[in-house]
């Protein structure tokens, strides 16, 4: 199992990336609203929101607050850190699908939220992250 220093470093990087992207997205959407364009948060961005919250609440917080955790609580930061890494990896593919750069190049017209390929990738990513989280959390030592 990874040491607390490594887990907190990975969670901090994930959180920093997620918060930076969220500020970028909000700024962009406010500008789009001023231009009369539809305003939305792409479904793919919710992967980053979830990864950020998981990193802060299920990795950093337990590492700081629980000094002598045992059993499932001891594995919680590692499970959450692994899941948030999957969420960030899935975000990359999903946001590319949202902008039709990865899948959907033959689609025309305005983008939908979510794009069909984006929706599939987001749900697959969420399922994989949840499965990995559960596996690590419940794995016997």
Would you name each region that the model predicts?
Residues 29-40:
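Cytosolic, membrane-interface loops and tails of multi-pass inner-membrane proteins
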Residues 39-141:
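Alpha-helical transmembrane segments of integral membrane proteins
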Residues 15-31, 89-103:
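Membrane-water interface of transmembrane alpha-helices
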Residues 1-21:
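Hydrophobic transmembrane alpha-helical segments in integral membrane proteins
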């Amino acid at each position: 199992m990874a040491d607390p220093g490594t887990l907190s470093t990975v969670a901090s990087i994930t959180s920093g990336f997620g918060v930076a992207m969220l500020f970028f997205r909000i700024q962009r959407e406010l500008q789009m609203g001023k231009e009369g364009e539809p305003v939305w948060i792409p479904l793919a961005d919710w992967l980053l929101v979830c990864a950020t919250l998981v990193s802060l609440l299920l990795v950093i917080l337990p590492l700081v607050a629980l000094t002598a955790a045992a059993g499932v609580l001891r594995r919680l930061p590692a499970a959450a850190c692994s899941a948030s890494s999957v969420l960030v990896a899935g975000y990359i593919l999903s946001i590319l699908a949202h902008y039709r750069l990865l899948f959907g190049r033959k689609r025309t017209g305005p983008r939908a939220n979510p794009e069909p390929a984006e929706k599939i990738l987001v749900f697959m990513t969420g399922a994989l992250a949840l499965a990995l989280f559960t596996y690590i959390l419940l794995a016997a030592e």
